Amino acid sequence: GADVVVYSTTKHMDGQGRTLGGAVLGSEEFIKETLLPFHRHTGPAMSPFNAWVILKSLETFPLRMERLLGNALSVAKLLESHPKVKRVIYPGLESHPQHELAKKQMSGFGNLVAFELHGSKQDIFKFMNNLKIVDISNNLGDVKSLITHPATTTHSNIEEEERIKLGISNSLLRLSVGMED
């Protein structure tokens, strides 16, 4: 099991990317020995307004999640069948190596779909720049569809050879599927 659970409240719990926040859950020992010293410098709580926004947003959480998960599975299936897509990484697909495990552990498979395209880095950027509904971002905290290129954003400080070993090629994209029709 997990000793610590970290939640971002920015995307799913907030629902609109209006707040920044999170929650850290752990044993009393972890909270006192590890987290408390950090909190003394940063403060342990978000603002009352952000807390209220998140609380209100939780009222629509089940509806939003149903839509996000359904859209993500549809997009993953579409990408998997497209000839310009090299591979799709999404646990909701039967082709995913851990699909059976994911079915046992999850009631839904999330809305983050990673995929690789055939082509050069320039081709990948051209693809991203031609998207009409999806916004390019390095922050995936919203209910609209957002895409990022990990090799030049989140993992840009890792040498290319190491990134490739980690499975983060120049053609890998991460798509946070939103609630659009």
Kindly give the residue locations of the regions a language model identified.
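Positively charged, small/polar-rich N-terminal and surface patches that mediate targeting and assembly
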Residues: P44, R87, G141-D142, T148-P150
